[in-house]
Every structure is written in C-alpha cells, then in structure tokens.
Swiss-Prot record:
Lineage per the UniProt record: Bacteria, Pseudomonadati, Thermodesulfobacteriota, Desulfovibrionia, Desulfovibrionales
Name this polypeptide is given: Large ribosomal subunit protein uL6
Pfam families found in the cross-reference section: Ribosomal_L6
An example Gene Ontology biological process: cytoplasmic translation
Name of the encoding gene: rplF
Protein role: This protein binds to the 23S rRNA, and is important in its secondary structure. It is located near the subunit interface in the base of the L7/L12 stalk, and near the tRNA binding site of the peptidyltransferase center.
GO cellular component terms listed in the entry, alphabetical order: cytosolic large ribosomal subunit
Annotated stretches, region: Disordered: 155-178
Oligomer and partners: Part of the 50S ribosomal subunit.
UniProt feature, compositional bias: Basic and acidic residues: 155-169
Similarity comment text for this entry: Belongs to the universal ribosomal protein uL6 family.
Keyword Protein transport: no
InterPro entries: Ribosomal_uL6-like, Ribosomal_uL6-like_a/b-dom_sf, Ribosomal_uL6_a/b-dom, Ribosomal_uL6_bac-type, Ribosomal_uL6_CS
UniProt KW keywords: Ribonucleoprotein, Ribosomal protein, RNA-binding, rRNA-binding
Record organism: Nitratidesulfovibrio vulgaris (strain DSM 19637 / Miyazaki F) (Desulfovibrio vulgaris)
Metal-binding in keyword set: no
Length: 178
C-alpha cells in the first residue's frame, strides 16, 4: 500500500470538497480548484477527512494512489493558504517591474521581456525579489520556472534570475598565466 496514498487528508473549516465521477472540486476562502479523479481509485469524504482507496491492485492504481492524494492535498492547501515562489534578479542593471498582470524583466537583452500572469496568479516586487503567488501549486511553479528560464543564473558571476533558496554552483575563471 502507498505510504502517502493511505494517509487521510484533513479538511479544514471553511473548505468544501465535492467528489464527482470525473473530478474532485475543492472550494475555499481563496477560490475553487478542480483536480481530476482516476477510474481505479475510490474517493470518500468521511467525518472531516478525504480518504482515497484503490478499487483494484493494478500497477497503474498503485502508481496513481500517492499522486492523486498529493494533488488533492495541494488543492486543499491552495484554497486555504495558497502557494508562493520567490525569485531573485541578480546583475548590474537587471530590473524587474510589475504593471497590472504583466511582469517586465530588463535582464541584459536589447528589449524588455514582458510576461503575462494567468488568472489567479499574483506577482509582487520588493527590490530585486519577485514573489509569484496563487492557489494552484502547479501554475505558480510553472510561471516561476518560465520567468527563471528567461535568464538562468550563470556560473561565473552568478548573474541571472534564480530561486530564492537556490545555490548556484560557481566556477573559477580562466587561470590567465603563462
């Protein structure tokens, strides 16, 4: 049995979970999230907890058990607390600005790179730090990865866009001797 999949998911107060045939809908103070169900898994809401069990013991059911439980737990956390990722822009002349739902990056190109934030995702700037926050962990992570991809941190001077907790492996430059 999946060590993660067998754990029940606690439903906090103010959160409503509806189990359908195709998807599970989670409503909370921060919004609504929907995650698809799997045909080989059974979903049940019992006394303030969501329990996911396997209908069959096939390889796909075993593989999906822990995954679907984690996805549902992420939905519940997303509609209550939300998720956020912080990016740091490092480099002389590198700037980041938020204008409405657009993030404008000036990171050494001849033009500013403008990225649009999808619905439900918010961006804030404090100095050289950009914080992406929203209800869906998947969307927040994808947007943060796309922004980082614009100018990955380089190993010699460390310039670029990096995650706040990321360690950049630095390299020594040329030795330059004869």
């Amino acid at each position: 049995m999946s060590r993660i999949g067998k754990l029940p998911i606690a439903i906090p107060s103010g959160v409503e979970v509806k189990v359908g045939t195709e998807a599970v809908e989670v409503k909370g103070p921060k919004g609504v999230l929907v995650t698809p169900t799997h045909t080989e898994l059974n979903y049940a809401v019992e006394d303030g907890h969501v329990v996911i069990t396997r209908a069959t013991e096939t390889r796909t059911a075993r593989a999906q058990h822990g995954l679907r439980r984690t996805l549902l737990a992420n939905c519940i956390q997303g509609v209550t607390k939300g998720f956020s990722k912080t990016l740091e822009v490092i480099g002389v002349g590198y700037k980041v600005a938020v204008k409405g739902n657009l993030v404008e990056l000036a990171v050494g190109f001849s033009h500013p790179v403008i990225m649009e934030m999808p619905e439900g995702v918010e961006a804030k700037v404090e100095g050289q730090k950009l914080t992406i926050s929203g209800t869906s962990k998947e969307v927040v992570g994808e947007i943060a990865a796309r922004i980082r991809r614009v100018r990955k941190p380089e190993p010699y001077k460390g310039k670029g866009i990096k995650y706040d907790n990321e360690q950049i492996r630095r390299k020594a430059g040329k030795s330059g001797g004869k």
